[in-house]
Design a protein with these regions (language model features):
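N-terminal pro-sequences and low-complexity stem/linker regions of secreted or lumenal proteins
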Residues: 29-681
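Gram-negative bacterial Sec-dependent N-terminal signal peptides
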Residues: 2-27
Length: 681
C-alpha cells in the first residue's frame, strides 16, 4: 500500500528535490528532460535567447524573417507551419490501451500497467482499475462515500448509437462528404448497431467483470457504439479526487474509480427535471460505456498505431477542462474559460435556469438539481456559497501545491463549464440570447487569434462545413461550439479576422498551393470527428490520413510543417493516467497526442506533462512571442520539472510543457547554410 502524505510533507519533498539540483534532474532525464526556457517565457527581451528543449546542447534554431510586416517565418525552430487537428472524445487508454511502442520506448497504458492483457482480458493488476458504487445525497460530493465495489459492471446500453449507418452507400456519402480518402467512404455506410436507441446493447456480454471492457471482443472496429457522459461536475466525480489519498506518484489523490457509477446515477444531467420513475442503472442510457477500450494489439486504430510507431506520441497529454467539447475548445483558444458578460464585457448574472446546481435532488442518489445541455452550465466559482464550488476549492487548497491563481476564478464571474452555443453566427450576426437559447453572449476576452494578429503571425481556423459562414455544409454537421473564435467579439466583428474562418476545401487548397498560414487549427465535421455514437474512430483516422498525405505530397511544405493530432477531451471514457489539477476547471483525463513531422520521426513516446494550452505555449515559443494571451491564461504556467523515475508528475506543479519535447531538431539543416550558423545558443 502506498504511503499517504499530507500537504506539508509532499510540499517539503518537492522543495527538497528541487534544492538538490535541477541540473541533476535534467541530466538524468533522457526521454523528457525539463524545458529550460522559463526565463525566456517570462517576458524576456527579444535579443535574449534561452535554451529550448529539442535542440542539442540547449541550442536554438533561428530563422530570419522575410521582409515586410508578416512575421510568420520568424521561428525559433525549423517549423514554419503547424496544423492542429482535433477529433472528439477519446481518452489515451481508450485508444492506446494495448499499444506496444518500438524497442527502447516505454508507454504507460492499460497493458503496461498490467490492468489488461494484450488479448483484452483482465490482467494481473486489474484491481488498479476497480470501479466502485457510491452514495451522494444532499450537497454535491467531490469524492462520494464508497459503498461497495461492483461485483459485475452495469450492462452496456446502445444510447444514441445509430441503428443504421448514416448513408446507404459509399457513393451517397462521397457526394456529400469531402473529408475522406476515396477508399474509406464505405465506412459511412456500415457499422449500425441493428438495435434501437437506449436499450441493452446485446452485442456485449450480459455479465461484465469489474474491469475495462475490450470492445474488440464484441464489436468490429467499424461498428458504431455508445457515448459516455462528459460534463464538468460529472467528470470531477468520476475521477474521485481526495487530497487525503495523495502519494508521491499521485499528488492529486485522484482514484479514477467512479466512472460507471456517475454514468448510471446522473448521466448527462437532469436539465432541472425530477428523476424519472422506476430509475435503474439503464435509465440514463449509458450503463458502463465509460469502461470500453479499443484493442490496437488486435488491429483496432491501425492508422493511429502506424503514426505512433513512425512519429512521436505523448502518453501524458490532457484535456484542459473537466467536461465536454465547448469548454475545452474555448480553453485552447483563450487559455482560460470564458464567462457570461454584459455588452461592456463586465461579468453579469445568467438566467437562473442556466446556473449549475450539482447537489442531489431530495430522495435521490446523485441526481443533480440543475445540470444539462438544456439546463445549468454556468458557475460563479469564486463564491463558496454556489453549489459545488466549495468542495472543489477546498480540495484544491488541500493539495500539496498551490492552484494556478488560487483556482483562477474572477470574482462575480459565471464561467461556462459545458456546451452552449457561441455568441455569433458564422456571418457575424450576434446569436439570439435568452433563458431558452443556451447561448453565451459574445466575449471580449483575449484569445490566441488576437495574440497572433497583434504579432503579425498568420492563422486560420478550418472548420469542415463552414460554407462561407452559413455553417450548413456537409448536411449541417459543422461544429459551431468547436470554433473558439465564434465566441469572440473582436474576431467576429472584424471582417478581415472573421474571414480567417474557412472550410475544409480551403485547407486542401492551401496545402496544395503552398499558401498555408503559420498556425492552422482544423476541425472535422460531426460525421468524421470520431465522436462516439455520432461518428467512429476510423472515420477520424481517415480525415487525418487525407491531410497528412496531402502535406507529405508537397515536399516544400513537409520540410517545415508539424501536424499535431489530438482530441478535444476524453469523452468520459476511463483512463488510468495521472491528472494534475491546475485550477478550478481542470485538467481532466489523458487524451492522445501525435506529432507528425520530419523532426518527430522514430516512434518516440514522450512523457512530459501537457494539456491543450501546451499548443498555445508551442506557438508562442516557436514564433518568439514574448507575450501571453492574458494575465490569467494558462500559457503563463512554467514548463514541468520531474524526477527521471517518474516523468509524469511535475514537481513544480502546476506546470505544462510547450511540446518542444515532441521534436528532435538535431538533424535540422538548411541548404546553403552551415549547421554552426543555423544552431545558435
Amino acid at each position: 500500500m502506498s504511503t499517504i502524505f499530507r500537504r506539508s510533507r509532499l510540499r517539503a519533498f518537492a522543495v527538497g528535490a528541487l534544492a538538490t539540483g535541477i541540473a541533476g534532474l535534467a541530466s538524468a532525464q533522457t526521454a523528457t528532460p525539463p524545458d529550460q526556457d522559463a526565463t525566456f517565457r517570462a517576458h524576456a527581451h527579444t535579443a535574449d535567447h534561452h535554451a529550448q528543449q529539442g535542440l542539442p546542447g540547449g541550442m536554438v534554431m533561428l530563422h530570419r524573417p522575410d521582409d515586410g510586416d508578416d512575421r510568420s517565418n520568424r521561428t525559433r525552430t525549423p517549423i514554419k507551419h503547424v496544423i492542429l487537428l482535433i477529433g472528439e472524445n477519446r481518452t489515451f487508454d481508450h485508444v492506446y490501451a494495448t499499444y506496444t511502442p518500438p524497442r527502447g520506448q516505454q508507454v504507460r497504458n492499460l497493458l503496461s500497467e498490467g490492468i489488461v492483457n494484450a488479448d483484452g482480458t483482465p490482467g494481473p493488476q486489474v484491481a488498479k482499475a476497480q470501479q466502485w458504487q457510491a452514495q451522494s445525497t444532499g450537497k454535491f460530493a467531490l469524492a462520494p462515500q464508497h459503498t461497495a465495489p461492483y461485483a459485475t459492471l452495469p450492462a452496456m446500453n446502445t444510447g444514441g448509437a445509430p441503428t443504421q449507418a448514416p448513408f446507404a452507400s459509399a457513393q451517397q456519402a462521397q457526394a456529400i462528404e469531402p473529408g475522406l480518402p476515396d477508399a474509406a467512404y464505405g465506412e459511412l455506410a456500415a457499422g449500425g448497431t441493428g438495435l434501437p436507441n437506449h436499450v441493452l446493447d446485446t452485442r456485449f456480454p450480459a455479465t461484465l467483470p469489474n474491469a475495462p471492457v475490450d470492445m474488440h471482443a464484441s464489436l468490429g472496429y467499424d461498428d458504431y457504439a455508445n457515448s459516455p457522459v462528459h460534463r464538468f461536475f460529472q467528470m470531477w466525480q468520476q475521477l474521485d479526487c481526495d487530497a487525503d489519498a495523495a502519494t508521491l506518484d499521485n499528488l492529486s489523490g485522484c482514484r479514477n474509480d467512479l466512472f460507471p457509477w456517475v454514468e448510471t446515477s446522473v448521466g448527462a444531467g437532469s436539465n432541472g427535471k425530477p428523476q424519472p420513475a422506476n430509475f435503474t442503472d439503464q435509465t440514463t442510457g449509458e450503463g458502463s460505456t465509460a469502461m470500453q477500450f479499443l484493442n490496437i494489439a488486435h488491429g483496432d486504430a491501425p492508422y493511429f498505431a502506424e503514426l505512433a510507431r513512425t512519429y512521436a506520441l505523448s502518453d501524458n497529454f490532457h484535456q484542459s477542462v473537466m467536461g465536454g467539447t465547448g469548454a475545452n475548445h474555448i480553453m485552447l483558444g483563450y487559455g482560460e474559460p470564458i464567462w457570461y458578460d454584459d455588452a461592456q464585457g463586465h461579468p453579469a448574472v445568467p438566467p437562473a435556469n442556466q446556473i449549475e446546481n450539482p447537489d442531489a435532488q431530495p430522495g435521490t442518489n446523485n441526481w443533480y438539481v440543475q445540470d444539462g445541455y438544456g439546463g445549468g452550465s454556468y458557475v460563479d466559482c469564486a463564491d463558496d456559497n454556489q453549489p459545488g464550488v466549495a468542495q472543489i476549492r477546498n480540495y484544491l487548497h488541500a493539495l500539496p501545491y498551490d492552484a494556478f491563481h488560487g483556482g483562477n476564478c474572477r470574482r462575480n464571474a459565471y464561467y461556462l463549464l459545458n456546451n452552449y452555443n457561441p455568441g455569433y453566427l458564422g456571418d457575424g450576426t450576434p446569436a439570439p440570447l435568452g433563458a431558452s437559447q443556451f447561448t453565451i453572449p459574445p466575449t471580449k476576452q483575449d484569445n490566441l487569434a488576437l495574440l497572433l494578429s497583434r504579432h503579425r503571425v498568420s492563422w486560420k481556423y478550418y472548420g469542415e462545413g463552414w460554407d462561407n459562414g452559413k455553417e450548413d455544409g456537409e448536411g449541417g454537421s459543422y461544429c459551431n461550439i468547436c470554433n473558439p473564435f465564434l465566441y469572440s467579439e473582436q474576431v467576429m466583428t472584424n471582417p478581415k479576422l472573421r474571414a480567417r474562418n474557412q472550410d475544409i476545401n480551403d485547407l486542401y487548397s492551401d496545402i496544395r498551393n503552398g499558401t498555408l498560414p503559420a498556425v492552422s487549427i482544423a476541425k472535422p465535421d460531426g460525421l468524421l470527428d470520431g465522436h462516439p455514437a455520432s461518428s467512429k474512430l476510423d472515420l477520424y483516422e481517415g480525415y487525418v490520413q487525407k491531410i497528412v498525405e496531402m502535406v507529405k505530397a508537397n515536399p516544400t511544405l513537409w520540410n517545415d510543417t508539424a501536424i499535431m493530432v489530438t482530441f478535444d477531451e476524453g469523452g468520459g471514457y476511463y483512463d488510468s493516467g495521472y491528472v494534475q489539477p491546475i485550477d478550478f476547471f481542470g485538467d481532466g483525463t489523458r487524451i492522445p497526442l501525435l506529432v507528425i513531422s520530419k523532426y518527430s520521426e522514430g516512434g518516440h513516446v514522450v512523457h512530459t506533462y501537457y494539456d491543450h494550452v501546451s499548443f498555445d505555449k508551442f506557438v508562442e515559443a516557436n514564433w518568439g512571442l514574448h507575450e501571453r494571451i492574458s494575465q490569467r491564461s494558462r500559457d503563463n504556467l512554467p514548463n514541468p520539472v520531474a524526477l527521471p523515475e517518474d516523468p509524469y508528475v511535475p514537481l513544480n506543479a502546476p506546470a505544462i510543457g510547450n511540446l518542444m519535447d515532441m521534436f528532435d531538431f538535431r538533424l535540422a539543416h538548411q541548404p546553403g547554410r552551415d549547421d554552426d550558423e543555423a544552431l545558435q545558443d
